[in-house]
């Protein structure tokens, strides 16, 4: 055997190492509770058992102390250790302050005890006794009696409807009421109700983000350029709105400017400014660095107003306000596409607004056209669900105006645009919904007056090959610079051709342009006659309701049947216009010479 002491083999025996309670202590404890004859063996066994249990309790308490990241063992740790071992904790030993123990000895004994403080009974008797708080009780009172609030202390003083309305629209008024004591709510008796205790509450002022001098100057220049008469400057301003990443602080003011501008110009029937404001909306939507979701409550009503408003211009029968409605419809579709979520249900709410106009027989025809245009831009499923079932109702609305029984030229023009819009958006959907053959009689029974024309359009769509279908886009508002004699004009109409046809031989694309809506200028028609091939012999008529301005001819058409010599000699109209200014015909009331086999004529509309 080695000289090293042997380690204990059991946990209980390991607990005997270190300090332990002696057998004499156990005898003293036994005598204190009335057990006088305790043998030495029993005292020894009890001392060992008590020492083991005390050490385990102290070890567990130390664990609680370490978990609590404390360096000092507390009474709470001992209590938690006792609870873990299913032992009822000791009570009466919890104190916030440190309790000093006093040492005393005498008669062969050493005692530790706490020294009690001396209490002066005279001081206690002289002080006023504290009132015992009352128990919590519930008491009922009448809040309203037959719709009238009684004037009792438990009820707040009633406020008049005028003061409630003022508080709702102007939150700052509450701070003024706190300063003025007489501005409290008036009871029903008419007497001023004064409060005994007046409390001053400081209301935090509404925070407004102030713009720097440079930002204010930029905002002023941008807004003036966007609604001004200088077209190149407007194009630069719109380009800045669509690409500048530092417009976050000015975005609330921009949206408010657009919303207030639409309100004012709709009342004044200023079509040009409404177009400019919608172009600002388009520029803001195209800016990838702006987050417009917080400002849709101002933009959506403005765009919706330009779509379904009853009148947008001074002369609805002549001015081309239909282009603005189409452009605003595309803006609304873009807003729904970008910001529609399962939370806000934006597209569902917009669709519900448009569909209400189709359900009401009192809706103005201009508003009806705007609703149809807005629904048609939201996709084929929307057309299938909301427009197709109401075709017969719409047909009955516009039939009297198209047959000449209506005396209003405005309604007649609106009915014609509604028919054109339906013939444009419905045939592709009807081709999918209905199977061939298509008969005019069936379409008339299902869709009324518009049935035969829709049947012809559906048959044309079925027979036309997919590669030869030319899609004519609605009137858009172009923000690109315009190369013409009138540089400050604004493009309203645009015909878009497929990419495969732009690589062919020259054709014609009409770009009517307006500068501002002038009240003293009648409408015009531009007739463009092509002479290159027999297939292009039919004249294209484009109506516009603005003052006469320049016509820019660009090269885009399908000329597969044109001869090689003619194609090589004619070239592109746009290239010819760049080579010589004589190749661009700017006409107002006279006939122009032919340019590359194309004759352009302009005449007054009757």
UniProtKB/Swiss-Prot annotation:
One of its GO terms (molecular function) is protein heterodimerization activity. It holds the Pfam family TAF. Keywords: Nucleus, Phosphoprotein, Transcription, Transcription regulation. TFIID is a multimeric protein complex that plays a central role in mediating promoter responses to various activators and repressors. This is Transcription initiation factor TFIID subunit 6. InterPro entries: ARM-type_fold (IPR016024), Histone-fold (IPR009072), TAF6 (IPR037796), TAF6_C (IPR011442), TAF6_C_sf (IPR046344), TAF_TATA-bd_Histone-like_dom (IPR004823). It comes from Drosophila melanogaster (Fruit fly). Belongs to the TAF6 family. Belongs to the TFIID complex which is composed of TATA binding protein (Tbp) and a number of TBP-associated factors (TAFs). Taf9 and Taf6 exist as a heterotetramer. Interacts with Taf1.
